[in-house]
């Protein structure tokens, strides 16, 4: 009988515990491997330096201030459970819930056309406005300490993680959001990792290029190389307790936006009243039981949808190699044949993207 796991952290630990021979082999590499590792060390150090240059971190919120904001986050969760938010405000997944305010955007299975760069903002009014407490308790403090300018934020997302949850390697869509990307952490300490590779079945996460501890009440600002040229993620082993992060961003004025007629949902908030509104705005729930291998995955791997945004169309006869999609866009000039663009009967090129769904 196969073992069962409550979350991904246990499964990651079991992989190393159950495979001592493999561990010993890694501890005793061949001379060729040692030479390759020695040669790559300067490159890794240089990349880590570039990542570090694009990160600003400051501790702004005291424990008392954190507790007050965390109570407000709990209120958001409660309102979502009661179905008091608009349909596209809440996005649920096992071990991770997202709450979009101000601006929301499509991704994964929500996309009409799958692939990098296909994300679209929802029409205005499709998600709820940024709560007053976010402006008063969070954004105002950031403006006062000159972390962001006045009027910068028009999109606020609350990611609420349970122990063992995570988000795979990704780059925030450059065609949707301006830089910097600002996040504020609550409930517990965690870490942000850069340049990790996620592998599934079995679940594995590679060592990061750069590991950034993130404390409760701290503000993390990403720009430059850290925001655009390398992926970031939250690993399951780094979420030991419940953790929430408030992500504050500004959408680009030229960011593509869905038209009302293209939405999968046909409801219009201004026409809803009384029981009709309550009926349509019910909480969104996953219809699939939590799976240790898939619990933390969004509808499409963000590493696929974000990092391949710079991919080029390849001839039909070229096939995808064994290279991982992780970090593909950063080295596309070296491995241009790692992805194949194959058409249907008409032979037209179509971007091939690895899909994973709930």
Swiss-Prot record:
EC number(s) recorded for this UniProt protein: 1.14.11.53
Taxon lineage: Eukaryota, Metazoa, Chordata, Craniata, Vertebrata
Annotated catalytic residues: 105
Cofactor list: Fe(2+)
Composition-biased stretches (Acidic residues): 32-46
Written domain comment of the UniProt record: The C-terminal disordered region undergoes liquid-liquid phase separation (LLPS) for the formation of paraspeckle membraneless compartment.
Purpose of the protein: Dioxygenase that specifically demethylates N(6)-methyladenosine (m6A) RNA, the most prevalent internal modification of messenger RNA (mRNA) in higher eukaryotes. Demethylates RNA by oxidative demethylation, which requires molecular oxygen, alpha-ketoglutarate and iron. Demethylation of m6A mRNA affects mRNA processing, translation and export.
Reaction(s) this enzyme catalyzes, per UniProt: an N(6)-methyladenosine in mRNA + 2-oxoglutarate + O2 = an adenosine in mRNA + formaldehyde + succinate + CO2
PANTHER family with a match to the protein in the record: RNA DEMETHYLASE ALKBH5 (PTHR32074:SF2)
Disulfide bonds: 196-233
Listed Polar residues bias regions: 262-278
Name the UniProt record assigns to this protein: RNA demethylase ALKBH5
Entry-linked InterPro entries: AlkB-like (IPR027450), AlkB-like_sf (IPR037151), ALKBH5 (IPR032860)
Segments of this protein annotated with the region Disordered: 1-50, 259-312, 334-358
Residues that bind 2-oxoglutarate: 159, 161, 170, 232, 243
Textual note on the cofactor: Binds 1 Fe(2+) ion per subunit.
Subunit structure: Monomer.
Keyword flag Signal: no
Bias type Basic residues, positions: 279-288
């Amino acid at each position: 009988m196969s073992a069962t796991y409550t979350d991904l952290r246990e499964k990651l630990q079991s992989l190393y515990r159950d495979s001592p021979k493999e561990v010993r082999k890694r501890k005793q590499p061949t001379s060729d491997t040692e030479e390759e590792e020695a040669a790559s060390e300067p490159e890794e150090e240089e990349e880590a330096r570039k990542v570090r240059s694009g990160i600003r971190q400051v501790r702004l919120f005291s424990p008392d201030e954190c507790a007050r904001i965390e109570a407000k986050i709990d209120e958001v969760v409660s309102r979502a459970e009661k179905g008091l938010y608009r349909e596209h405000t809440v996005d649920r997944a096992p071990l991770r819930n997202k709450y979009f305010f101000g601006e929301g955007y499509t991704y994964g299975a929500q996309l009409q056309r799958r692939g990098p760069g296909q994300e679209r903002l929802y029409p205005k009014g499709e998600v709820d406005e940024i709560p007053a407490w976010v402006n008063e308790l969070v954004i105002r403090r950031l403006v006062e300490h000159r972390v962001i300018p006045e009027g910068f934020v028009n999109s606020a997302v609350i990611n609420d993680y349970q122990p063992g949850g995570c988000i795979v390697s990704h780059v925030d869509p450059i065609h949707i959001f301006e830089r910097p990307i600002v996040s504020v952490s609550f409930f517990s300490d965690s870490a942000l990792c850069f340049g990790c590779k996620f592998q599934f079945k079995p679940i594995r996460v590679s060592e990061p290029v750069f590991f950034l501890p993130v404390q409760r009440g701290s503000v993390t600002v990403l720009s430059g190389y850290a925001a655009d040229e390398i992926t970031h993620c939250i690993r399951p082993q780094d979420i030991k307790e419940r953790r929430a992060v408030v992500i504050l961003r500004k959408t680009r004025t030229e960011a593509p936006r869905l038209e009302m007629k293209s939405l999968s949902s046909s409801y219009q908030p201004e026409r809803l009243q009384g029981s009709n509104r309550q009926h349509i705005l019910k909480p969104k729930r996953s219809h699939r039981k939590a799976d240790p291998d898939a619990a933390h995955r969004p509808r499409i791997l963000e590493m696929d949808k974000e990092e391949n945004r710079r991919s080029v169309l390849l001839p039909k006869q070229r096939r995808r190699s064994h290279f991982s999609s992780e970090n593909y866009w950063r080295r596309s000039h070296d491995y241009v044949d790692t992805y194949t663009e194959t058409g249907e009967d008409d032979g037209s090129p179509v971007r091939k993207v690895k899909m994973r769904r709930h």
